[in-house]
């Protein structure tokens, strides 16, 4: 399942990516978000009731607390966290990350991270480097 979150739900979009879900963060106008959702077959997640009413395949999220937003999405769409997919997407740009050799990140991550971790991943688009705990 793929998502697009409206501009009020940037933190939720980031956490859906952490859980491995392909999630765009839309900062365009409502018509643009709907077009992307339709073209890419994405569920539109929004806090905007009007936007929700304009697009059938949308989910209205109420409240501002992240934990409740995540729980609401997971429960409403019957989603589960799949640990195989968790941490598989860049939290910044949504691109799938790929594993990278430890020697390739030397000098590019904090020394403590380099010394205490053996597994690293990189986003091929924005070049952000990840390790367990980032």
Residue ranges and their predicted role:
Residues 25, 125-134:
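Metal-cofactor-dependent catalytic cores
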Residues 83-87, 116-119:
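Short metal-coordination and nucleic-acid-contact micro-motifs, chiefly zinc-binding Cys/His arrays
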Residues 88-90, 101:
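Short, glycine-/small-residue-rich phosphate/pyrophosphate-handling segment
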Residues 90-93, 123-126:
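Short cysteine-rich clusters marking metal-coordination/redox-active sites
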Residues 95-99, 131:
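Short functional micro-motifs and their immediate structural scaffolds
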Residues 102-105, 134:
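A short secondary-structure junction signal
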Residues 106-120:
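Short linker/helix segments within small regulatory modules
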């Amino acid at each position: 399942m793929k998502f697009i979150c409206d501009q009020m739900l940037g933190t939720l979009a980031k956490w859906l990516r952490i859980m491995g879900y392909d999630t765009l963060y839309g900062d365009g106008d409502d018509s643009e978000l709907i077009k992307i959702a339709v073209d890419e077959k994405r569920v539109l997640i929004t806090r905007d009731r009007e936007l929700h009413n304009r697009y059938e395949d949308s989910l209205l999220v109420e409240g501002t607390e992240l934990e409740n937003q995540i729980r609401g999405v997971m429960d409403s769409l019957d989603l589960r966290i799949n640990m195989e997919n968790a941490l598989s997407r860049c939290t910044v740009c949504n691109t799938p990350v790929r594993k990278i050799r430890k020697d390739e990140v030397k000098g590019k991550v904090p020394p403590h991270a380099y010394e205490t971790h053996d597994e690293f991943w990189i986003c091929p688009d924005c070049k952000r480097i990840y390790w367990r705990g980032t």
